Amino acid sequence: MPVLRDRIPRRGFFLGLALLAALSGCSSTDTFEQPVPVPEIEASVEFERVWSMSVGDGHDGDFLYLAPLVTGDLIYAASADGELYAVATETGEVAWESEFEDRIFSGLGGDGQNLYLTTENADLVALSREDGSEVWRTSLPTEVLSSPQSNGSLVVAQTTDGKVLGFSATDGEKLWQYDGSVPVLSMRAAAAPLVGGDVVIASFASGKLIALTAASGQPMWQYEVGQPQGRTELERLVDVTGQPLVIETAVMVVGYQGKLALVDIRTGQEIWSRKASSLYSPMIGGGQIYLAAADGEIIALRGSDRREVWTQDRLAWRQLTQPMVYEDYLVVGDFEGYLHALDREDGSLVGQREFDDEGIRVPAQRLANGNLLVFGNSGKMAVFQVKPQD
């Protein structure tokens, strides 16, 4: 289950993981269950490793989401203890590595010139893509868990207390700030903002999706993904923690105890919606929508009418990552560090591999060459191909 945070004004405040894991499964619609054991399957596909390496101590025991940044020929990766790497996508050869003096709190964002990250002390830092050297840094009001995002001229960071801030990509000058509202209790996770040329779209723990002008941070529209219901703060959780998925002139978004919806990116008008509860963005492939529900079910929906095609419940409550489409398969990771491959046609479990005994929290990423990049909580990073067994 995801870790929760409450609004105590203290940076880096962590609540007890075991207690919160139990609490976070409780809601007005879900009953907390223990994660099912790793299912025994008859595997027909395998995860064939192309290359692997270690990125420092990974999340180093903290509840972070240090997703690597993939940019064509290079993968940029960071660990909480300050190790930075630029790695060749094809071979895993290290192009450069750097020791960062601060503790890192967010995954990497980037543009054509710089990489961007945030620190435990709530600094936004720009680094050179050439060698990882520091270009500029600026202070933030409080901690940021999601990766800063940039359109090349504007860098946007979203704090855990609901502030969205825009900075100049050139020198870090603060350009604007939007103050969103957040509930007393929320998940210890946050969606990275979407940053386009004219619009910034931010997701909030209040269940709101809000579009801001990139030039000034002024609100353009807002959409309610989830509406708090119930008497307790736990029942009223409606966090949107997955980055919205852009589909031409619309965005697809899902919330915890909320809904899955397609929204017009220009106006915020709902195109369609259906009830759903998830902490990760949906995935699209072959005309279908794939969703890892908060209770561990994986659901395939027909894109044309959102009717269920299949549901896989053999990974219940295993804290699954966002599904990733790989050819005829769907790949998810879980809290015990297993990778699972599902047949996209019927959702059956067809492959399995233990990857990182500290767990997998960051969703797998598809590389330009078609391979699969996986980053584990301990800092293990590897590229796989998913193939039928010989």
Swiss-Prot record:
Signal peptide: 1-25
GO annotation, cellular component aspect: cell outer membrane
Entry keyword annotation includes Oxidoreductase: no
Alphabetical UniProt keywords: Cell outer membrane, Lipoprotein, Membrane, Palmitate, Signal
PANTHER family in alphabetical order: CELL SURFACE PROTEIN (PTHR34512), OUTER MEMBRANE PROTEIN ASSEMBLY FACTOR BAMB (PTHR34512:SF30)
Role description: Part of the outer membrane protein assembly complex, which is involved in assembly and insertion of beta-barrel proteins into the outer membrane.
Protein name: Outer membrane protein assembly factor BamB
Source organism: Marinobacter adhaerens (strain DSM 23420 / HP15)
The gene coding this protein: bamB
